[in-house]
Amino acid sequence: MPSKNCAKNLHACQWERDIALVFLGLMVLFNIGQVVYMNRARLYRLIRRGAEQIPADDEEPIIGIRD
């Protein structure tokens, strides 16, 4: 909450706003991290499934790329 002096001097309460924004940003990052950590098994499964679909030896290489 801004202090009562903010109405008189707006520059005096800028640090309060900055601290609140940093705190809010850290809370958002923490919550995103919790969601990722909670669903990490599902994410790892999706990554593994996507990696299995990559062929080891491509029958039709991209035109212009030669070994």
From Swiss-Prot:
InterPro entries (alphabetical): Sid-5
Record's keyword annotation contains Transport: yes
GO cellular component terms, semicolon-separated: late endosome; late endosome membrane
Keywords tagged on the record: Endosome, Membrane, RNA-mediated gene silencing, Transmembrane, Transmembrane helix, Transport
Cytoplasmic side: 40-67
Deletion phenotype: Defective in RNA-mediated gene silencing.
A GO biological-process term: regulatory ncRNA-mediated post-transcriptional gene silencing
Localization (cell): Late endosome membrane
Pfam families assigned: Sid-5 (PF17204)
Name of the protein: Systemic RNA interference defective protein 5
GN (gene name): sid-5
